[in-house]
A protein has these predicted regions:
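Function-dense linear segments that define catalytic or interfacial modules
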Residues: 3-95, 100, 107-115
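Internal maturation/activation junctions in enzymes
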Residues: 69-92, 96, 118-179
């Protein structure tokens, strides 16, 4: 296994400290690829954005389009939770109770090339940080909008939710919207 970089290491205690669900669902393991730590009977509806699609011919980022697609993707992934048929009642109860979704990305390297940036250079690193901050903030604001429309997920407790390691790192705008 060491010759192919597998198995990877995952520090589940760190995941639990960062997890927004720390107060109602202790994470126990990850899915096979490792991108999603989950609790017992946990599932997560996953989706991905192709970042290369958000650069125009002038090497500019289509920020408004990106924000729109992020918000649409969050709504779509949330709707999938209700459309799913779950084979085990524990999974059904769990997923509908916490409404966990995961919106990831692909195409970062291609996006950087289209922008004329070299992966790993300082400018690319700074841009990538701003990009992922935008992704996270827009996704959380879209989730807040859904909560206003449909109601918060059943296990939501704003005070506890905002105590997670991840939410402590979010902007004041997002934290205020969640509260």
């Amino acid at each position: 296994a060491w010759a192919s970089a597998e198995p990877g290491l995952h520090f589940i205690d760190r995941s639990n400290k960062m997890s927004n669900s720390w107060y109602f669902a202790r994470l126990q393991a990850t899915n096979p690829c490792g991108e999603q730590p989950l609790e017992a009977y946990g599932v997560c509806t996953l989706g991905a954005l192709n970042l290369a699609k958000f650069v125009d011919e002038d090497r500019d980022i289509l920020w408004n389009k990106l924000r729109y697609v992020i918000r649409t993707a969050v709504r779509l992934l949330d709707n999938v939770i209700d459309a799913n048929e779950y084979h085990f009642p524990e999974i059904d109860d769990n997923h509908r109770g916490n409404r966990r979704i995961g919106l990831g990305v692909m195409g970062l390297a291609e996006m950087l090339v289209r922008m004329g940036l070299k992966y790993g250079d300082e400018e690319a690193v700074v841009f990538t940080g701003a990009l992922f901050e935008t992704l996270a903030e827009e996704a959380y604001l879209a989730s807040v909008d859904l909560a206003k429309e449909k109601g918060a997920f059943p296990r939501f407790d704003a005070e506890k939710y905002l105590q997670s390691g991840f939410m402590r790192g979010m902007s004041n705008e997002v934290r205020a919207a969640v509260h």
